[in-house]
Structures are given as C-alpha cells and as structure tokens.
C-alpha cells in the first residue's frame, strides 16, 4: 500500500521528552509541540489505515517533503535537523497507534529520505508486506 499525506511535516520528534520530578521520582512527558505533532500525524494517517493490521514482517519507505522556501531547490536533500531516525520513530509510533500493525518491531526494512519540495509538501509512505 502507498499514500501521500499532504501536510507540513512536523519537525519535532519523539526524542524531545521532558522530565520533571514527582514525589522524588523522574516523570517523563511530551511537551505540547510533540503532542501536537502526534495529533497532526495521527489525523493524517487514520484515513489510510488498512482494514486489518499487517501481520508479520513489513518494509516501510517514507519520503519527507519539507516546504523549500526561497533558499532551496525542489528535490534537494534536506541535510539539517531533524534526523531521519527521530522522524521515523514518531511516525512509526503514530502508525502503531492507528493500527497499521500490532508492533513497530514488525518493520524489518526501512528507507527514509528528507527533501526540500515545491508544493505540495508532505510525507509519501509505502508499506510492503514481506510475508506474501
């Protein structure tokens, strides 16, 4: 399956947890921008949710297309933050929550790209069932 989510991709990542002490113990939480990014990704993913979650091994390909502005060319690699592994973690967490698969450990092969783009910006996703 493949689909395109027409959106400004989030630039905050799942690794941006905050910590506070509660009763002498550390309590980790997501700051508001991370919560907003999760909501945005989830809202764009839900219309593409498969009828049944993938079972077994899958390959995930994601192309993150960020609005290029005036300083970059269409298709140019985005070599600035956020890192691809951090972007993917947030995306896979949201895909798991939406029911694309039971556990993101099922993703055994990944391809990730970050590019600057003319409109539309967004995220192109392709999921391949490797069990077939």
Q: Where do the language-model regions lie?
A:
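Acidic, proline/glycine-enriched N-terminal capping motif
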Residues: 1-132
């Amino acid at each position: 399956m493949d689909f395109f989510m027409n959106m400004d991709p989030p630039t905050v990542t799942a690794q941006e947890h905050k910590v506070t002490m509660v009763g002498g113990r550390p309590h980790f939480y997501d700051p508001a921008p991370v919560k907003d990014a999760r909501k945005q990704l989830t809202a764009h993913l839900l219309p593409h949710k498969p009828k049944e979650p993938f079972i077994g091994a899958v390959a995930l390909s994601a192309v993150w297309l960020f609005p290029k502005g005036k300083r970059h060319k269409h298709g140019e690699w985005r070599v600035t933050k956020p890192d691809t592994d951090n972007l993917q973690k947030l995306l896979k967490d949201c895909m798991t929550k939406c029911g694309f698969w039971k556990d993101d450990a099922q993703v055994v092969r990944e391809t990730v790209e970050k590019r600057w783009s003319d409109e539309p910006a967004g995220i192109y996703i392709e999921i391949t069932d490797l069990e077939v």
